[in-house]
Amino acid sequence: MNNKAVIAMSGGVDSSVAAYLMKQRGFDCIGVTMKLFANEDIGISREHSCCSLDDVEDARSVAYSLDMPYYVFNFSDRFETDVIDRFIHAYENGITPNPCIDCNRYLKFDKLYMRAKELDRDYVVTGHYARVEKDGNGRFLLKKALDNTKDQSYVLYCLTQEQLSHTIFPLGEMRKSQAREIAESQGFINARKADSQDICFVQNGSYADFIEQYTGKNYPDGDFLDKDGNIIGRHKGVIRYTVGQRKGLGISAPEPLYVKAVNPVSNTVTLSYNDGLYSSIVKAGDINLISVPEIKGEMRVKAKVRYRHTEQWATVTQNGDTITAVFDEPQRAVTCGQALVLYDGDTVVGGGTIIEVE
């Protein structure tokens, strides 16, 4: 392989420091910002999103300070198809998606990787907090970042062996505070820039408002049901609810009520008390295995069912393109559409999209 790399630059601190570290290692680097959407096309202001002109200018400033060529690649068509449309379709079907995983799967480590190959560059570099290593059998491994509070391996479980072999995560062995210190020492314009939060294309955290504005649809009110199927109130459209949600229900009860299930076919939302949210068996499809080519028999792992979840002990089995995890202890508010990610210590075994919960 050559020492030529494409640095995916968002305009934030982490990708800027990743670029600096790669230059320090002697790599021939070019900086690239992926233009994922035109803000006016999806009805948000530039101040509240990534891909804004400010972000592009921040990335350009850092690239130039590092004497590194810089380009903006327009991937907006793919982003609309592979991320936004999938995001909307999921909520319309009572599923809670993770668009960051789709963006990694279809854009950062697919479309950008293919563009890097066209430019005769062997590596894609990002500011993710994770690590890539190679085991004694020549298999590439995805590992947690040393800074567990910033670890992003959960949203990277979809990377293939081919992609991992051409991916570098320079920040995987440092803390966020160290990254900021480097940015400040180099005088980067974005050294004190706040970390990005929530979903990049959703303004003010209201994903349901975004969906209604983007699609032009009005999602009809429907019935809230209790666990026995009795009508106990009215909801404001199924896209506004996700499993485990308590806020915004507007239902009085002796104990707090939570969303247990969303059924777009009947246009109903089932509510339950907290003790009705627990489940032990989680099935995932569209799987990607990293540390092993397949899971034979039963495998003991720790597993996460959402990004901020602390991984828990489970026994996992594989059946074709699905995996089933049986947790030692019931887990709260496991949600279809999120990722089930398996860990062996700090190594990602693999994962998939949750399709069934019992």
Q: Over which residues does each language-model region extend?
A:
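AMP-forming adenylation/ATP pyrophosphatase catalytic core
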Residues: 127-133, 139-358
